[in-house]
């Protein structure tokens, strides 16, 4: 591939590619620490910090942080390892199993999105406390439900409860944001020819 493209080629996870794209071409340009979380058929995350993608011993398993279930939520969770992790409770298949319909068909059901926002905000609170990102970008099919963003921001602020006070957290609309590059056209780019 390197010979055909005349440039270095590497492989990584899709979400690391997403966070790198946002830092390089998108709304996270100039940020030193950014987290990208995709919530769709599963949940995955990429972390960019001080010019590098975070790998550690493996890639971050951000979808498997444990969540405290709401008492009224009788859904067991679908993750075969944890049941009550973010992916097991909040990914698209979990929404469909819990409510009996796909997320796209539940847009007008506020109870669905209140619960979803609560679980996502719990996970984001953990990431804020441990990763300390300057921006959190949310992508994936579930996040196409635009009503989720204000609900997540509100719950995240409640969960942080004033423990951390920063300019970023004071401006939640620019702190927890939707992915920006999915709607960008790349027709202006020219690939090398052989």
Protein language model features and the residues they cover:
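Short glycine-aspartate micro-motif
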Residues: 34-38, 44
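General beta-strand structural signal in soluble alpha/beta enzymes
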Residues: 9-14
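Active-site-adjacent loop/helix segments that line or gate small-molecule/cofactor pockets in enzymes
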Residues: 15-19
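ATP-binding/phosphotransfer module of carbohydrate and carboxylate kinases, centering on a glycine-rich
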Residues: 1-7, 21-31, 47, 53, ...
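A short acidic/small-residue loop/turn micro-motif
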Residues: 60-63
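Short secondary-structure boundary segments
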Residues: 39-41, 140-141
């Amino acid at each position: 591939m390197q010979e055909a493209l005349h440039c270095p080629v590497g492989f990584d996870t899709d979400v690391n590619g997403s966070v790198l794209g946002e830092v390089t071409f998108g709304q996270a340009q100039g940020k030193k620490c950014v987290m990208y979380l995709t919530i769709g058929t599963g949940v995955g995350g990429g972390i960019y910090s001080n010019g590098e993608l975070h790998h550690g011993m493996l890639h971050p398993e951000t979808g498997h942080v444990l969540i405290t279930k709401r008492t009224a939520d009788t859904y067991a969770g679908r993750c075969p390892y944890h049941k009550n992790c973010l992916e097991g409770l909040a990914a698209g298949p979990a929404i469909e199993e819990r409510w009996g319909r796909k997320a796209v068909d539940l847009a007008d059901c506020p109870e669905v999105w209140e619960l979803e926002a609560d679980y996502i905000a719990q996970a984001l609170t953990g990431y804020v406390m441990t990763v300390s990102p300057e921006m959190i970008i949310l992508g994936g099919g579930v996040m196409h439900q635009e009503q989720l963003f204000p609900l997540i921001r509100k719950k995240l602020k409640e969960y942080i409860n004033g423990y951390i006070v920063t300019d970023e957290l004071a401006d939640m609309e620019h702190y927890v944001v939707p992915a920006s590059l999915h709607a960008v056209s790349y027709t202006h780019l020219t690939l090398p020819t052989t």
